[in-house]
Amino acid sequence: MSAEVETSEGVDEPEEKNFGENHIRMADLSELLKEGTKEAHDRAENTKFVKDFLKGNIKKEIFKLATTALYFTYSALEEEMDRNKDHPAFAPLYFPMELHRKEALTKDMEYFFGENWEEQVQCSEAAQKYVERIHYIGQNEPELLVAHAYTRYMGDLSGGQVLKKVAQRALKLPSTGEGTQFYLFENVDNAQQFKQFYRARMNALDLNLKTKERIVEEANKAFEYNMQIFSELDQAGSAPASETVEDRIPVHDGKGDVRKCPYYAAGQVNGALEGSSCPFRAAMAVLRKPSLQLVLAAAVALAAGLLAWYYM
């Protein structure tokens, strides 16, 4: 009976098997991410910062502050990864020994700023928005955390190595790794093999198609946060000489737990922190007046993350 049905439908067993395998491959999360973020890649491809960084057009002070932006980003990301290390939608991707960057970034911060570096650094508002988004996802929609982990770490294992060499050459940093510990993955012997292993783990996550589509959407959102940094930089660069960047761009002070801020708590209700700035941040901007280099730093740091995708 079953043989007659297969014949009448015109589909034999080998063809049906091939169709099933092709369908599974097309539904793999890694493939969906690759295709679903292609437009974002194309838009980022022409970013001036990407081209300048590859040419080695970066000053040491900007690179120092770019490291600061990375520190805040990875501190948030790894805090949420630790929080969700047992969550079924993320546990298979939890590799703190191999991937976590906070400790390495701490060494870089000490190299650039000295032992009291924590007293000297803060995060621009545009970069802080991404940090807040990561915290929101980790606490409320952990199934989407893979979008941020995959975007960052897979890029770091790829193009990050190119950026390390560019930075060492352009800034005359020690070849022994001081100032570029962020790019050194001591517990990953073969980056290409590890990336393949990570993608396989990601594809094996028990997720329905709707959740996978949401993950792709979240990855694109991460790119948009990067673009907001570039937009902020454009506005700062076009500000009249009489108008300081600090007057145009409020910042968060980067200390304490931002999630205790009443404005942040209210934003959590809506699922995102967008729109007007926190009044506290605006006040802090007036009182503390961070330098233009801080804004540039955050832009370079996130541009580096975008560039890393092109070498995956």
From Swiss-Prot:
HRM repeats lie at residues 260-265, 277-282. The modification Phosphoserine is found at residue 2. The gene is HMOX2. The keyword Glycoprotein does not apply. InterPro entries: Haem_Oase, Haem_Oase-like, Haem_Oase-like_multi-hlx, Haem_oxygenase_CS. One of its GO terms (molecular function) is heme binding. Belongs to the heme oxygenase family. It catalyses: heme b + 3 reduced [NADPH--hemoprotein reductase] + 3 O2 = biliverdin IXalpha + CO + Fe(2+) + 3 oxidized [NADPH--hemoprotein reductase] + 3 H2O + H(+). It comes from the Eukaryota. Heme b binds at residue 41. Keywords: Acetylation, Endoplasmic reticulum, Heme, Iron, Metal-binding, Microsome, Oxidoreductase, Phosphoprotein, Repeat, S-nitrosylation. The modification N-acetylserine is found at residue 2. Its EC number is 1.14.14.18. Its main location: other. The modification S-nitrosocysteine is found at residues 261, 278. CDD domains: HemeO (cd19165). One of its GO terms (biological process) is heme oxidation. S-nitrosylated by BLVRB. Heme oxygenase cleaves the heme ring at the alpha methene bridge to form biliverdin. Biliverdin is subsequently converted to bilirubin by biliverdin reductase. Under physiological conditions, the activity of heme oxygenase is highest in the spleen, where senescent erythrocytes are sequestrated and destroyed. Heme oxygenase 2 could be implicated in the production of carbon monoxide in brain where it could act as a neurotransmitter. It is found in: Microsome; Endoplasmic reticulum. PANTHER family: HEME OXYGENASE, HEME OXYGENASE 2. This is Heme oxygenase 2. It is an enzyme of class 1 (oxidoreductase). One of its GO terms (cellular component) is endoplasmic reticulum.
